[in-house]
Design a protein with these regions (language model features):
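Conserved phosphate/ATP/ADP-binding segment of small-molecule kinases
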Residues: 105-187
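Conserved post-catalytic alpha-helical subdomain immediately downstream of the catalytic base
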Residues: 201, 209-252
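Glycine/small-residue-rich loop that forms an oxyanion/phosphate-binding "nest" at active or ligand-binding sites
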Residues: 75-123
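Short pre-catalytic strand/loop immediately N-terminal to key active-site residues, enriched for Gly-Thr
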Residues: 190-201
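Conserved N-terminal subdomain of the carbohydrate kinase-like
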Residues: 2-95
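Charged C-terminal helix
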Residues: 233-278
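Acidic-glycine-rich active-site phosphate/pyrophosphate-binding loop
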Residues: 3-15, 171-192, 264
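General beta-strand structural signal in soluble alpha/beta enzymes
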Residues: 24, 46-48, 93-97, 121-125, ...
Length: 278
């Protein structure tokens, strides 16, 4: 068990105890990257998004990922049905707030999904600011520079702590320069990663997929979140040290998903701490 300074004691989640089946309801842009990321860490993805299939798959899956990057009336209905069924069967669920910063409809959907007590709700700084009812200058699906300024980050951490206290069954994660975790009454931060991870699409989606995979493998929500975020960011750090160009960097980051776990000491490189009560 690794006792990180200022962070909860967590165990190395790799190798997985079994190959959890993760149902992913996601967008067409990053669906392949997410499926492969789950496979690279020895999970099993199923990209089932049709309501008439849910009853069968809910009997099989170990975790559910709801990514708001795909959006239409049919998708909204499917996300709500899947969320409700997963809650009834106590299947751990991750909700990814893709596009919430720029869309009132997605924000309304996210608030409805919160009512079904997902294990994790995640988004970038701008998405999480909107979800916490803070002003944001985010556009589209990307976080804005203003939302990543020190004062704005501190404001977000405080708002997330308030939200987590109101919804103690859910962990809230904001990804950015510092990844912020709010759970129950505590706020933590993680500091691994490189700027290049913001330069190819799907990095946040992959983190959501990794969190869901670890939850499906029976890991508690703090272990799953800290491990998934830090593991992916450390994969990026390794990739940057050996590649030139963003295409090669992307490929090597994905390669490292299956390789970094071979280093039994990888968790020694996790950087972060606890912010405490703000």
């Amino acid at each position: 068990m690794m006792n990180l300074v200022g962070l909860p004691a967590i165990e190395n989640p790799f190798p997985l105890m079994h190959s959890p089946l993760v149902q992913c309801m996601t967008n067409v842009v990053t669906v392949e990257s997410m499926a492969n990321a789950i496979l690279y860490v020895d999970g099993k993805p199923v990209m089932a998004d049709q309501v008439w299939e849910f009853e069968d798959f809910m009997e099989q899956i170990d975790a559910l990922l709801l990514n708001l990057g795909g959006f239409s009336p049919n998708i909204v209905q499917a996300l709500l049905v899947a969320s409700s069924q997963a809650q009834a069967k106590q299947i751990p669920t991750v909700v990814d707030l893709v596009g919430v910063a720029g869309s009132t409809l997605r924000l309304d959907l996210a608030n409805k999904l919160l009512g079904n007590q997902p294990a994790v709700i995640k988004g970038n700084y701008s998405e999480m600011r909107r979800f916490c009812q803070l002003p944001t200058s985010g556009r589209g699906v990307d976080a804005s520079d203003d939302d990543q300024a020190d004062e704005a980050v501190n404001e977000l951490a405080q708002a997330m702590q308030v939200l987590a206290a109101k919804s103690p069954q859910t962990l809230f994660l904001a990804t950015g320069i510092k990844d912020i975790i709010a759970f129950e009454e505590n706020v933590y931060y993680l500091e691994n990663g490189v700027n290049q991870l913001d330069r190819f699409t799907g990095t946040g989606d992959i983190v959501g997929a990794l969190i869901a995979t670890l939850l499906g493998d029976g890991k508690d929500v703090m272990t799953a979140t800290i491990s998934a975020v830090s593991y992916f960011n450390l994969c990026g750090e390794r990739a940057r040290s050996t590649t030139k160009g963003l295409a090669d960097f992307r490929q090597e980051t994905l390669n490292q998903l299956s390789l970094l776990m071979e280093d039994s000491l990888w968790m020694n490189h996790i950087k972060g701490g606890q912010l405490g009560k703000l």
